[in-house]
A protein has these predicted regions:
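Active-site core of metal-dependent hydrolases
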Residues: 159, 163-280
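Alpha-helical scaffold segments that flank or form the walls of functional sites
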Residues: 55-57, 64, 74-126, 149-164, ...
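Divalent metal-dependent hydrolysis catalytic cores, especially in the metallo-beta-lactamase
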Residues: 66-67, 83-110, 125-138, 165-176, ...
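N-terminal metal-binding scaffold of metallo-dependent hydrolase/deaminase domains
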Residues: 1-42
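His/Asp/Glu-enriched, well-ordered alpha-helical/loop segment
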Residues: 232-241, 260-271, 277-361
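Conserved, mostly hydrophobic/aromatic
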Residues: 54, 132, 187, 213, ...
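Active-site gating loops and adjacent loop-to-helix segments of metal-dependent hydrolytic enzymes
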Residues: 88-98, 139-165, 207-220, 233-240, ...
């Protein structure tokens, strides 16, 4: 199909926006971008014209840390469920995602799911690969985990995991644990991003193979004026930082601190969403724990957050209420993550030749329509 989206408020990249622009789609790709809708006369008869009447157009969102949605989780999803997850993500504007395998899995469970997901690519939202949140995590920062499944880093185990899959893109590790540096180097050498999280690490524990921090502030030591914790390190602007911006995992005033002081190119919005996302309020089981969903909170019976129940789009609304610009929201929700994984030449901005993964929204960021690989999905 060939579409011409006109009278659109185009958020192009982290610096540019066109208030009355136009964007042409030919097949899977963006075929042209116009700074003003009055520039389209020469090509208008070749496309199906769609008047957006000033609505926002942004690149599709990339959620690099999510565990599932609507009772379906990556820890045990088969290919049919993966298609359903892919569709529900697309409806929320998440056109690309990593499947996060949780620390509730044994090594044997990891093996099985790595094998299951090896040849999956995403029927709707794109499946870009796997994030292993475990098993090499600190028992001091369990989250909702089972301490028996938190293991010491084991290079042979990682090598065995890598024999099962070519799709591993990221692993979360507690970098202070003995053997972590050897695992980190191996992963780095195999183009897998190394994230430090569920960790008691401080600055001295890190090395050149660490790429960033998993869900900043959560499951790590807090900011300190003498100990250089991972939170302190985040403000050095040397590492990428996952940020859950639901207003619960990180207080809104602390979110302001982050966006005002951490380099805008280093922040990656993630949901860390649970299988209770998109469900009604009530009681659910997640990662072998009984949890309660109430509004935007999902909490175990002993008071711990068990992941979120929001979308990237929901988090963008929170940040917009804090005064974040549309161009910065593009960075946080899309481009930074694509750049982190080396995919930014194909995704993450509205530029000629890139994939037409688009989210159409009103000025309050309510999603109206989606395009995935140039295919229209009505919300």
């Amino acid at each position: 199909m060939k579409y011409l989206l006109k009278h659109a408020h185009l958020i192009i990249d982290g610096n540019r926006e066109f208030l009355d622009g136009a964007l042409a789609i030919d097949g899977e790709r963006i075929s042209d971008v116009f700074v003003h809708s009055n520039k389209i006369k020469d090509i208008a008869d070749k496309y199906e014209e769609i008047d957006l009447k000033g609505q926002l157009v942004m690149p599709g969102f990339f959620d690099t840390h999510t565990h599932g949605i609507d009772r379906m989780g990556f820890d045990n999803a088969g290919l049919e469920q993966m298609d359903k997850i892919s569709y529900e993500f697309a409806l929320d504007g998440t056109t690309s995602f990593l499947a996060s395998l949780s620390y509730d899995l044994s090594p044997e469970d990891f093996d099985e799911q790595l094998t299951t997901l090896e040849d999956y690519h995403g029927k709707y939202a794109r499946f870009e690969g796997i994030h292993m949140e475990g098993p090499f995590l600190s028992k001091k920062h369990l989250g909702v985990g089972n301490p028996d499944l938190f293991l010491m880093p084991d290079l042979q185990m990682v090598e065995d995991f890598m024999k099962k899959t070519s799709r591993l893109k990221q692993m979360t590790i507690a970098y202070e644990l003995e053997g972590a540096k050897e695992v980190g180097k191996y992963l780095h050498d195999h183009d897998v991003r190394v994230m430090c999280g569920h960790s008691d690490a401080v600055y001295e524990d890190l090395d050149e193979n660490v790429d960033g921090f998993t869900h900043l502030f959560n499951a790590m030591r807090p900011l300190h004026h003498r100990d250089i914790t991972l939170v302190n390190c985040a403000f050095m602007n040397r590492w990428y930082c996952e940020l859950i911006a639901d207003g619960n995992h990180v207080d809104r005033n602390v979110l302001k601190l982050v966006i005002n002081n951490i380099d805008k190119d280093k922040i990656i919005l993630v949901t860390d969403s649970s299988t209770a996302r998109n469900l009604e309020d009530g009681e659910y089981e997640f990662m072998s724990k009984k949890c309660t969903k109430k509004g935007t909170k999902f909490i175990t019976h002993d008071g711990h957050y068990a992941g979120s129940v929001v979308s990237i789009n929901d988090e963008m609304k929170v940040l917009r209420e804090l005064g974040v610009k549309y161009t910065d929201l593009l960075l946080y929700s899309s481009l930074n993550a694509f750049r982190f994984y080396g995919l930014d030449k194909q995704f993450g901005t509205l530029e000629k030749g890139k994939y037409a993964d688009l989210v159409i929204m009103d000025d309050e960021l309510n999603i109206k329509d989606i395009y995935v690989r140039g295919n229209f999905i009505h919300v």
